[in-house]
């Protein structure tokens, strides 16, 4: 019969899996409590870094419908449950692992799909969501500005031509008249 604290732990882990849009499975062997605290701080408020019991995590993942970590839960495992921007959390893990090589990224899950450790690293190399959105907005604004200039060009050319004619008339020079066409001769059929 399962212990009440294990049942509560499985419920909590299941909720974390369901609330997270991404998760990264790591091995933390050799890291001190102070280093783990430093990692939690580096990951920010939108990421929960939890040291787990593999059996309870396997049960919680099955209950949540997560298959990304099947067969990978062995040894000292911890998962970074990410509810915010996964790029920022992946950068935090990458930067921490550079200074603390004991932290090993095993795999991850992004929006319900399993991703490899290499994919987590590639995710860390992306720019944040806000930066990417601002770049898209900049491209859209530039495109609109170019379109506005394109549509305004014929109008401004016409205005400049009319202004030049006005200045020429004001200077006393007669405006060049358009050539007058002679009326067509009428033919009479007899």
Curated annotation (Swiss-Prot):
CDD domains the record matches: Ribosomal_L10 (cd05797)
Keyword DNA repair set for record: no
Keyword field contains Glycoprotein: no
Coiled-coil boundaries: none
InterPro entries linked: Ribosomal_uL10, Ribosomal_uL10-like_sf, Ribosomal_uL10_bac, Ribosomal_uL10_bac_type, Ribosomal_uL10_CS_bac
Annotated Gene3D superfamilies: 3.30.70.1730, 6.10.250.290
GO biological process, one term: translation
Keywords: Ribonucleoprotein, Ribosomal protein, RNA-binding, rRNA-binding
Top-level taxon: Bacteria
Annotated stretches, region: Disordered: 170-190
GO MF annotations in UniProt: large ribosomal subunit rRNA binding; structural constituent of ribosome
One CC-aspect GO term: large ribosomal subunit
Stored HAMAP family: Ribosomal_uL10
PANTHER family: 39S RIBOSOMAL PROTEIN L10, MITOCHONDRIAL
Subunit (UniProt): Part of the ribosomal stalk of the 50S ribosomal subunit. The N-terminus interacts with L11 and the large rRNA to form the base of the stalk. The C-terminus forms an elongated spine to which L12 dimers bind in a sequential fashion forming a multimeric L10(L12)X complex.
Family assignment from sequence similarity: Belongs to the universal ribosomal protein uL10 family.
Function statement: Forms part of the ribosomal stalk, playing a central role in the interaction of the ribosome with GTP-bound translation factors.
Protein's UniProt name: Large ribosomal subunit protein uL10
Record organism: Kineococcus radiotolerans (strain ATCC BAA-149 / DSM 14245 / SRS30216)
């Amino acid at each position: 019969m399962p212990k009440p604290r294990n049942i509560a732990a499985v419920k909590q882990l299941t909720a974390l899996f369901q609330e997270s849009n991404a998760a990264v499975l790591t091995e933390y062997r050799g890291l001190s409590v102070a280093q783990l605290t430093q990692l939690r701080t580096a990951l920010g408020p939108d990421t929960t870094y939890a040291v787990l019991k593999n059996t309870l995590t396997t049960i919680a993942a099955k209950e949540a419908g997560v298959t990304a970590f099947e067969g990978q839960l062995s040894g000292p495992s911890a998962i970074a449950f990410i509810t915010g921007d996964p790029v920022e959390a992946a950068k935090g893990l990458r930067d921490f692992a550079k200074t603390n090589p004991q932290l090993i990224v095993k795999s991850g899950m992004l929006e319900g799909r399993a991703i490899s450790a290499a994919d987590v690293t590639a995710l860390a190399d992306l720019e944040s969501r806000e930066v990417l959105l601002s770049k898209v907005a900049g491209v859209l604004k530039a495109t609109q500005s170019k379109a506005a200039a394109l549509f305004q060009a014929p109008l401004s050319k016409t205005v400049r031509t009319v202004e030049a004619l006005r200045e020429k008339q004001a200077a006393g020079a007669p405006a060049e008249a358009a050539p007058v066409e002679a009326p067509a001769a009428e033919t009479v059929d007899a």
